[in-house]
Curated annotation (Swiss-Prot):
Originating species: Ranoidea gilleni
Residue positions where Leucine amide is found in the record: 15
BP GO terms, sorted: defense response
Protein name as annotated: Caeridin-2
Function description: Caeridins show neither neuropeptide activity nor antibiotic activity.
Chief localisation class: secreted
Subcellular localization(s) per the UniProt record: Secreted
Domain of life: Eukaryota
Tissue: Expressed by the skin parotoid and/or rostral glands.
Keywords: Amidation, Amphibian defense peptide, Secreted
Any one Gene Ontology cellular component term annotated for this protein: extracellular region
Length: 15
């Protein structure tokens, strides 16, 4: 879902 995408982006940024 949308939150899954947000989590993926944050994970990619190392946040």
């Amino acid at each position: 879902g949308l939150l899954d995408v947000v989590g993926n982006l944050l994970g990619g940024l190392g946040l």
